[in-house]
């Protein structure tokens, strides 16, 4: 969405972490596709088919291809111009759930009691864009492969705030100005952002207020 030069901050540890996360995604999603075969009452729903059947305002940029090991579906919303990768959609009875898979360290996994705050905005985004109320987070311990699941259903207030924030960011892009960093952002907030160097370059200049 944002058209600006970015810095490649890849490191061996980051690459290794990403590769481990990819393996976990593939492992979990390969099992998800076989749930009915394994006697599990949950149903795996093809994301692209769901988009087409429900006439959602989404462009399918890339469909999943299980034979090639590509389990995510790449989508773009035609109204908000937001691109995202959907891990999957599940159905239980008459209710649909967005599936979001997260790999996590053993230490973080042990402490996990609910959906972390840092993932809630993503849950709101996917809920709005796909028109599905509840996101089912599946956390996988990347060391021991233990799993925990948590449901998160965004409120109407969260969805309204998300839309306002997106309108603000879109306006910043159109005006080619740097948005304010959130007040509650900690030192890790920008750690893996590809646009960190761009923001640092203009940090002393006037930023665009909401």
Per-range role (PLM):
Residues 80-81, 115-120:
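Short, glycine/acidic-rich beta->alpha junctions
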Residues 1-98, 105:
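Metal-dependent nuclease catalytic cores that hydrolyze phosphodiester bonds in DNA/RNA
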Residues 111-116, 125, 129-210:
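Metal-dependent nuclease catalytic regions and adjoining charged, substrate-binding loops involved
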Residues 84-91, 121-134:
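Phosphate-binding glycine-rich loops and adjacent basic patches that engage nucleotide phosphates
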